[in-house]
């Protein structure tokens, strides 16, 4: 007999970015984000006052990690910059890389910075009442470009998993988002980014597993 999970409803507090009845949560403090930003001197200078500050936090509802179910939750992210570069999340690709994700902006002004395994770059706005679709196979990272907290709801297949190392191994994401000096933002190249070799690209597409099972 099939065991059914209980339906659930979770309330989001836009003031705090908290979600009721979450099954789990985690925080990333400023010190946890070392190495993400181009201006290492600016990061070091900010550590004295920012080191223990929670830059972003996630609360989630995770019924299980089986194929066919969903994980959803809320990310709350502070506004700020390191040098000229806006605050970002660590970013990831899904371990099951053919799994998509949806983000729904609830408060603030944000961007989703996306990168294909080959290095194509896309930027999608995630403002309040904006839905952002992250297709399968795209590495993605959230950016807060506003002066207020960024609050986003997310939802993805329960068996997706996350791979954070793919960004670090490439020297970061190919693009960075910085203040344009006119109240907006602009995209610049990351000179430390390294193109992935064919084997790494194939692995990110999950081709190795498919070939083994063929």
Swiss-Prot record:
Gene coding for it: pgiA1
SUPFAM superfamilies from the UniProt entry: RmlC-like cupins
Family: Belongs to the archaeal-type GPI family.
Keywords: Cytoplasm, Gluconeogenesis, Glycolysis, Iron, Isomerase, Metal-binding
Further facts: R.meliloti has a classic glucose-6-phosphate isomerase (AC Q92SC4) and two archaeal-type glucose-6-phosphate isomerases.
Binding site for Fe cation: 92, 94, 101, 140
UniProt catalytic activity: alpha-D-glucose 6-phosphate = beta-D-fructose 6-phosphate
Designated name of the protein: Putative glucose-6-phosphate isomerase 1
Gene Ontology biological-process annotations: gluconeogenesis; glycolytic process
GO cellular component, one term: cytoplasm
Intracellular or extracellular location(s): Cytoplasm
InterPro entries: G6P_isomerase_archaea/bacteria, G6P_isomerase_prok, RmlC-like_jellyroll, RmlC_Cupin_sf
Enzyme Commission code(s) on record: 5.3.1.9
Subunit structure: Homodimer.
């Amino acid at each position: 007999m099939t065991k059914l999970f209980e339906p659930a409803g979770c309330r989001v507090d836009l003031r705090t970015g908290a979600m009721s009845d979450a099954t789990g949560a985690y925080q990333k403090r400023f010190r946890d984000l070392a190495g993400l930003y181009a201006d290492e001197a600016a990061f070091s200078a900010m550590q004295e006052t920012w080191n223990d500050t929670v830059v972003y936090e996630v609360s989630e509802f995770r019924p299980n990690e089986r194929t066919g179910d969903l994980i959803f939750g809320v990310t709350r992210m502070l506004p700020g910059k390191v040098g000229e570069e806006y605050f970002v999340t660590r970013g990831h690709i899904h371990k099951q890389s053919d799994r998509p994700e949806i983000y729904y902006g609830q408060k603030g002004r944000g961007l989703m910075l996306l990168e294909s395994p080959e290095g194509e770059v896309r930027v999608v706005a995630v403002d309040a009442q904006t839905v952002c679709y992250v297709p399968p196979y795209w590495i993605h990272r959230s950016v807060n470009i506003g002066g207020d907290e960024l609050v986003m709801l997310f939802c993805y297949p329960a068996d997706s998993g996350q791979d954070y190392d793919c960004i670090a191994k490439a020297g970061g994401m190919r693009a960075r988002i910085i203040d344009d000096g006119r109240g907006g933002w602009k995209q610049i190249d990351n000179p430390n980014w390294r193109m992935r070799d064919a084997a790494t690209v194939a692995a990110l597409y999950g081709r190795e597993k498919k070939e083994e099972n063929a």
